[in-house]
Amino acid sequence: MKALILYLKEVRRTIKSADETCRTAVKYGIKPELFAGLVPSKANEYIKEHKLGFYEPGPKLFRIKNAKGGVRGCMIGHLKMWKEVVKRNETTMILEHDSRVVSRTWNQDFEDILHLDAHKFEDDADSNTQPRVEEWEFSRKGEIQMNGAYGYMIKPHAAKRLIQGAYEDGITATDMFIKGKYVKIQVAKPRAVYVSGKRSYETSLTMNRNFNL
């Protein structure tokens, strides 16, 4: 299984962190490949060039998220990876630089997207159970959405549908954009991936001041 690991070549911390992600991926039978994302200023250029709008169905949360440079940069990074998945026509694992692979439960059948961590910053309540795939039921603002986009499997047809949705409906925070309207989301248990810290890829984009936002 191949994995794309999203990082920022302009932010040294994400490079070191992505190297650790690679190490953990190899340990569990995955072939990792670093994938350079875009800092907010370049993401804004990409959005303008591709005539992308913003998904703002009404709730204030979407407007707040869309106003953040880190949110825009993160989403464009994932969008570019989805395009790469379609180009290669291969089921692929998507990881962010602060993801850590901890098991082989990623290696299970799924339909469109397989979320690799049901518990985000919490302990894994499923750690001593048999590997399985379950329906993803997390809901936010009336939509079934991902909760964190730091680790998931995606099939080419699902990547294509997400790309279509981005151009038709507009973009927002990645984990709010990946939703039941476009794809079927399932979750692997016990977790295959965890996020190593609460400073996410999205936050790295927003907090770092070594590049022009």
Residue ranges, per PLM feature:
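An acidic/histidine-cluster motif and surrounding catalytic segment
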Residues: 1-95, 99-213
